[in-house]
Amino acid sequence: MADWDELEAALADYTAQCNGNERLRRMQRDWSRRLHFTCTDNGVTFTMEVERGEIVAVERGHVGVPDIVVSTDSETFCDMFWGDLNPVQKYLRGEITVRGSQEDVLRLDAISYVIWPES
């Protein structure tokens, strides 16, 4: 089970990877959303703010009203944010749940394929 410090480190790496990917930023330039994440094993929650395709904030706890809610265990979140696994496979197996509009779920799929193209 991962604690907040480990999650925060993984999120920092993921933020740098996403914000540094020009292709991804161009592709998502019209996408601004608030995402809530919930760790099902330890109750840790966090919020990610995306503005015009750039991750501009990540903070502990749920802040504001989400456009998308993602839930899984803390280790899966860490592995996902560090790029050690493709979240699409876990999503298809029901190990990651995503609540949001169909368009937003498809956007998350597209982000996954840009970040993890070999999957």
Model-derived features: where do they sit?
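Feature captures hydrophobic
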Residues: M1-S119
